[in-house]
Amino acid sequence: MFWWGDYSVSTEHMVYLNLKNGIPAPRSDSAEMNGLTIAEKIDGQIFIDTWGLIFPGDPANAAEDATITASVSHDKNGLYGAAFISACIAQTFVTNDIDELIDIGLSFIPSDSTYAAVVRAVSKFHAQNPDIWRSCLEYLQQNWGYDRYGGNCHIIPNAGVCVMLLLYGRNYPRAVEFSTMSGWDTDCNAGNVGTIMGVAC
Protein backbone atom coordinates (compact mmCIF):
# COMPACT_ATOMS: atom_id res chain seq x y z
CA MET A 1 0.00 0.00 0.00
CA PHE A 2 1.53 3.30 -1.07
CA TRP A 3 0.42 6.88 -0.85
CA TRP A 4 -0.48 8.15 -4.32
CA GLY A 5 -0.31 11.92 -3.85
CA ASP A 6 1.27 13.24 -7.08
CA TYR A 7 4.74 14.37 -8.10
CA SER A 8 6.72 16.35 -5.48
CA VAL A 9 4.10 15.48 -2.83
CA SER A 10 4.12 11.69 -2.39
CA THR A 11 7.49 9.94 -2.28
CA GLU A 12 6.22 6.69 -3.76
CA HIS A 13 4.25 8.38 -6.54
CA MET A 14 7.22 10.58 -7.42
CA VAL A 15 9.60 7.62 -7.63
CA TYR A 16 7.07 5.63 -9.69
CA LEU A 17 6.86 8.49 -12.17
CA ASN A 18 10.66 8.78 -12.23
CA LEU A 19 10.97 5.07 -13.05
CA LYS A 20 8.20 5.33 -15.65
CA ASN A 21 10.06 8.23 -17.27
CA GLY A 22 13.23 6.17 -17.62
CA ILE A 23 15.17 7.33 -14.57
CA PRO A 24 16.66 4.09 -13.18
CA ALA A 25 17.08 3.13 -9.55
CA PRO A 26 18.86 4.06 -7.39
CA ARG A 27 18.89 7.54 -8.93
CA SER A 28 15.08 7.53 -9.17
CA ASP A 29 14.75 7.60 -5.38
CA SER A 30 17.92 9.42 -4.35
CA ALA A 31 18.03 12.55 -2.24
CA GLU A 32 20.22 14.08 -4.95
CA MET A 33 17.44 13.57 -7.49
CA ASN A 34 14.37 14.27 -5.37
CA GLY A 35 15.67 16.39 -2.50
CA LEU A 36 15.67 15.60 1.22
CA THR A 37 12.06 16.69 1.69
CA ILE A 38 10.85 13.81 -0.47
CA ALA A 39 13.58 11.28 0.37
CA GLU A 40 13.09 11.61 4.13
CA LYS A 41 9.33 11.39 4.48
CA ILE A 42 8.00 9.00 7.11
CA ASP A 43 7.02 6.34 4.56
CA GLY A 44 10.51 4.84 4.76
CA GLN A 45 9.72 3.37 8.15
CA ILE A 46 5.96 2.80 8.07
CA PHE A 47 5.78 0.03 5.45
CA ILE A 48 8.50 -2.24 6.83
CA ASP A 49 7.05 -3.86 9.97
CA THR A 50 6.88 -7.18 8.14
CA TRP A 51 10.67 -7.51 8.03
CA GLY A 52 10.90 -7.42 11.80
CA LEU A 53 8.14 -10.01 12.04
CA ILE A 54 9.62 -12.49 9.56
CA PHE A 55 13.09 -12.25 11.12
CA PRO A 56 12.25 -12.84 14.81
CA GLY A 57 15.35 -12.44 16.93
CA ASP A 58 17.43 -11.48 13.88
CA PRO A 59 17.59 -7.68 13.79
CA ALA A 60 20.51 -7.66 11.35
CA ASN A 61 18.57 -9.37 8.56
CA ALA A 62 15.42 -7.42 9.41
CA ALA A 63 17.30 -4.11 9.15
CA GLU A 64 19.05 -5.14 5.94
CA ASP A 65 15.90 -6.20 4.10
CA ALA A 66 13.91 -3.24 5.42
CA THR A 67 16.61 -0.91 4.12
CA ILE A 68 16.56 -2.60 0.72
CA THR A 69 12.78 -2.27 0.58
CA ALA A 70 12.78 1.37 1.69
CA SER A 71 15.54 2.20 -0.79
CA VAL A 72 13.08 1.74 -3.64
CA SER A 73 11.55 5.08 -2.70
CA HIS A 74 13.57 6.71 0.11
CA ASP A 75 17.07 7.79 1.04
CA LYS A 76 19.19 8.88 4.02
CA ASN A 77 17.06 9.25 7.20
CA GLY A 78 14.21 7.56 5.35
CA LEU A 79 16.37 4.44 5.18
CA TYR A 80 17.62 4.76 8.74
CA GLY A 81 14.05 4.76 10.03
CA ALA A 82 13.37 1.53 8.17
CA ALA A 83 16.42 -0.13 9.70
CA PHE A 84 15.75 1.18 13.20
CA ILE A 85 12.09 0.18 13.43
CA SER A 86 12.50 -3.25 11.81
CA ALA A 87 15.49 -4.07 14.04
CA CYS A 88 13.50 -3.09 17.13
CA ILE A 89 10.61 -5.32 16.06
CA ALA A 90 12.88 -8.30 15.40
CA GLN A 91 14.72 -7.89 18.70
CA THR A 92 11.44 -7.71 20.62
CA PHE A 93 11.13 -11.48 20.11
CA VAL A 94 14.24 -11.81 22.31
CA THR A 95 13.69 -9.10 24.91
CA ASN A 96 11.04 -6.61 25.93
CA ASP A 97 13.57 -4.27 27.57
CA ILE A 98 12.85 -0.96 25.82
CA ASP A 99 16.30 0.53 26.40
CA GLU A 100 17.90 -2.56 24.89
CA LEU A 101 15.57 -2.41 21.90
CA ILE A 102 16.50 1.22 21.29
CA ASP A 103 20.21 0.38 21.53
CA ILE A 104 19.77 -2.46 19.04
CA GLY A 105 17.92 -0.18 16.64
CA LEU A 106 20.64 2.45 16.92
CA SER A 107 23.33 -0.13 16.16
CA PHE A 108 22.04 -0.44 12.58
CA ILE A 109 22.05 3.26 11.63
CA PRO A 110 24.83 5.85 11.33
CA SER A 111 25.61 7.32 14.74
CA ASP A 112 26.03 10.80 13.23
CA SER A 113 22.63 10.79 11.50
CA THR A 114 19.79 13.10 12.48
CA TYR A 115 17.68 10.01 13.11
CA ALA A 116 20.15 8.73 15.70
CA ALA A 117 20.34 12.21 17.22
CA VAL A 118 16.59 12.46 17.84
CA VAL A 119 16.52 8.93 19.30
CA ARG A 120 19.33 9.80 21.72
CA ALA A 121 17.76 13.17 22.58
CA VAL A 122 14.42 11.60 23.51
CA SER A 123 16.14 8.85 25.49
CA LYS A 124 18.14 11.45 27.42
CA PHE A 125 15.04 13.55 28.08
CA HIS A 126 13.20 10.48 29.38
CA ALA A 127 16.11 9.58 31.68
CA GLN A 128 15.90 13.05 33.23
CA ASN A 129 12.07 13.32 33.17
CA PRO A 130 10.70 9.77 33.39
CA ASP A 131 7.17 10.41 34.60
CA ILE A 132 5.30 12.93 32.43
CA TRP A 133 5.09 11.98 28.77
CA ARG A 134 3.46 15.27 27.76
CA SER A 135 6.60 17.14 28.83
CA CYS A 136 8.55 15.04 26.34
CA LEU A 137 6.01 15.80 23.63
CA GLU A 138 6.44 19.51 24.33
CA TYR A 139 10.21 19.05 24.13
CA LEU A 140 9.82 17.37 20.73
CA GLN A 141 7.50 20.08 19.45
CA GLN A 142 9.95 22.79 20.49
CA ASN A 143 13.17 21.13 19.33
CA TRP A 144 12.33 18.54 16.66
CA GLY A 145 8.98 19.75 15.29
CA TYR A 146 7.53 19.86 11.80
CA ASP A 147 8.56 23.51 11.53
CA ARG A 148 12.20 22.40 11.31
CA TYR A 149 11.77 19.98 8.40
CA GLY A 150 10.39 20.25 4.90
CA GLY A 151 7.29 18.59 3.53
CA ASN A 152 4.13 17.48 5.20
CA CYS A 153 5.26 14.38 7.09
CA HIS A 154 9.00 14.22 7.77
CA ILE A 155 10.45 11.14 9.43
CA ILE A 156 12.48 12.90 12.16
CA PRO A 157 9.69 14.41 14.32
CA ASN A 158 7.76 11.15 14.07
CA ALA A 159 10.83 9.08 14.96
CA GLY A 160 11.04 11.14 18.13
CA VAL A 161 7.40 10.40 18.89
CA CYS A 162 7.92 6.66 18.34
CA VAL A 163 10.82 6.55 20.79
CA MET A 164 8.85 8.66 23.27
CA LEU A 165 5.94 6.22 23.02
CA LEU A 166 8.18 3.23 23.67
CA LEU A 167 9.80 4.84 26.69
CA TYR A 168 6.75 6.40 28.29
CA GLY A 169 4.09 3.95 27.10
CA ARG A 170 5.85 0.83 28.39
CA ASN A 171 2.88 -1.33 27.35
CA TYR A 172 0.71 -1.79 24.27
CA PRO A 173 -2.50 0.05 25.25
CA ARG A 174 -0.74 3.08 26.70
CA ALA A 175 1.72 3.38 23.82
CA VAL A 176 -1.03 3.31 21.19
CA GLU A 177 -3.20 5.66 23.25
CA PHE A 178 -0.35 8.16 23.64
CA SER A 179 0.34 7.92 19.91
CA THR A 180 -3.14 8.99 18.94
CA MET A 181 -2.96 11.81 21.49
CA SER A 182 0.42 13.09 20.29
CA GLY A 183 -0.56 14.43 16.89
CA TRP A 184 1.63 14.48 13.80
CA ASP A 185 1.41 11.11 12.00
CA THR A 186 -0.78 9.36 14.56
CA ASP A 187 -1.75 6.28 12.56
CA CYS A 188 1.77 5.51 11.33
CA ASN A 189 3.38 6.03 14.72
CA ALA A 190 0.71 3.89 16.38
CA GLY A 191 1.32 1.19 13.78
CA ASN A 192 5.09 1.05 14.26
CA VAL A 193 5.01 1.32 18.04
CA GLY A 194 1.97 -0.93 18.26
CA THR A 195 3.86 -3.66 16.40
CA ILE A 196 6.83 -3.42 18.75
CA MET A 197 4.70 -3.33 21.88
CA GLY A 198 2.34 -5.98 20.54
CA VAL A 199 5.22 -8.43 20.14
CA ALA A 200 6.63 -7.39 23.53
CA CYS A 201 3.36 -8.25 25.26
Task: Please identify what each model-predicted range represents.
Residues 1-201:
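Structured, active/binding-site neighborhoods that engage oxygen-rich ligands
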